[in-house]
Amino acid sequence: MYKRLVQEFFPKLDFENLEKYVNLIEFSNKNFNLTAFSGDILWKEGIFESIFTMNFIVGLVNNKENKKLKILDIGAGSGFPSIPFLITNPEIELTISESMQKRCQFLKDVSEKLDLKFNLICKPVQEINPQKFDIITARAVANLEKLEKITKKIHFPKTLLAFIKGPKVFNEVQNCKNCNYKIIKVNNNINKKIFIAFKQVS
């Protein structure tokens, strides 16, 4: 069902490469412990949700010049949300920070076998050199207070911090003093409550 929904919503994507990616996750999951998703749930909460929410996040960026966006995905694990989005939008400049070596090896395999170009940093985000990213994102990595701390040294003015969250995000906002995140609900077709906690760094 959701595999077909992906095709319907994103007709211009490289669906063959997306299928290869899904098959690679299914094949590698036993050895790398990548995700609890499989089958139709993988297409729903892994693929569709990633593309849909990343499209939404990119829409929050003021990109009147239509420049190539530089995106950092923190702790992507099996590649969510950035790899499905990269497959549908190969023009972006993607960097992934992943500290777990097994998952990092999987992401290297993804790059090679799918011929995807992205920068892979196999260490914690706190240890990477500051760069002028347009967007820093993460999904299911940490609460907002921790994300605020670990990204503090790597962003620049005008960087958009945009983190994919569930309904508990409102508690996280209350616990993150002086963080000043805005919360917006992402209307979607998978009957799931998805929120984006975001702010532009001043």
Curated annotation (Swiss-Prot):
What EC class is this? transferase
EC no. given is 2.1.1.-
The UniProt entry, under Pfam families, shows: GidB
Return the GO cellular component terms, semicolon-separated.
Answer: cytosol
Q: Per its UniProt entry, which superkingdom is the organism in? A: Bacteria
- Record-linked InterPro entries: rRNA_ssu_MeTfrase_G, SAM-dependent_MTases_sf
Q: Which residues bind S-adenosyl-L-methionine?
A: 75, 80, 125-126, 139
- Record key words, sorted: Cytoplasm, Methyltransferase, rRNA processing, S-adenosyl-L-methionine, Transferase
Compartment annotation: Cytoplasm
Check the UniProt entry and state the signal peptide residues, or none: none
Q: Which GO terms describe its molecular function?
A: rRNA (guanine-N7-)-methyltransferase activity
Record flagged with keyword DNA-binding: no
Any keyword S-adenosyl-L-methionine?
yes
Task: Name the family.
Answer: Belongs to the methyltransferase superfamily. RNA methyltransferase RsmG family.
**PANTHER family (UniProt xref):** S-ADENOSYL-L-METHIONINE-DEPENDENT METHYLTRANSFERASES SUPERFAMILY PROTEIN
Q: What does this protein do?
A: Specifically methylates the N7 position of a guanine in 16S rRNA.
Output this protein's name: Ribosomal RNA small subunit methyltransferase G
Its source organism is Mesomycoplasma hyopneumoniae (strain J / ATCC 25934 / NCTC 10110) (Mycoplasma hyopneumoniae)
Name of the gene? rsmG
